[in-house]
Amino acid sequence: MGKVKNPFLKLCGIGLLTVICISVKAQKVNFTVNSKTGAIQSMNIDNDKQNMNWLIATDGSQYPWIKENYGWGLGYFTEVRRNQKNKLFWNLPASIKQDGREVTYRVGDICILVERSMRGEDLIEEYTFQNDGTEEILLSDIGIYTPFNDNYPGAQTCINMRANAHIWEGDNAAYVNAIRMGGYAPHLGLVLREGEIKSYEISERDRNKGNSHTRGIISLNLPDMKLMPGDEQVFSWYIFSHKG
């Protein structure tokens, strides 16, 4: 399938991210990968005095109902084949290479390759969905977990260690602007490079799971994919720090 590139300069004209695009003193984004799932389990910014983790802990320590299956970069889709629908998840890798910079998942005939690299101070993530089977497969309801640490445990913690994640699900111009609740820098941004984000979903939020004190688990939704045997679809974004 053809790839849709999303030029960086085009995105610089988008409302809230205009300031981000012209920032020239970005601080490096650091991350660690869960060796069991291949998901990103922490994301920090160099020289942040608070050493804030921009992601919810997925080991049950922050919320007992949020576990490793919600790690950053894991996800789900509904497979449609021969008029049958099955909801499937990728959460256990077939292989992890380069300390989590190259992770492969296999779910039925679908291979999901996650590649991570640094470009200057920014983190680039690329997701490739490939049909390794012998039949046409339609993927719908596709979501990638992006568990931003958007919740409200107490005033001091919120000011220093939590984010408001502002999501613009603007197709090929989508972005997330994660602002520290205290309003002071550094902050975190995510901008789409390739593909589209159509919408987002919230999981693990209800009356018995934090109610209004947590945003829940955010997943970004991709458009449906029709993959013939051997076809692939590529989707990517970059993550960077900014001053607000």
Labelled PLM ranges:
Residues 1-8, 57, 97-99, 108-110:
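Bimodal feature
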Residues 1-27:
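Bacterial Sec-dependent N-terminal signal peptides
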Residues 27-104, 150-198, 204:
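Acidic-aromatic substrate-binding/catalytic surfaces of carbohydrate-active enzymes
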Residues 27-37, 104-108, 117-120, 142-151, ...:
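Beta-strand-rich recognition/accessory modules
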Residues 44, 106, 126-128, 140, ...:
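Beta-strand residues in well-ordered beta-sheet regions across diverse protein folds
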Residues 112-114, 137:
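Type-3 copper protein
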Residues 121-125:
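Short, solvent-exposed loop/turn segments enriched in Ser/Thr/Gly
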Residues 129-134:
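Asparagine-centered strand-capping/turn motif at beta-strand->loop junctions
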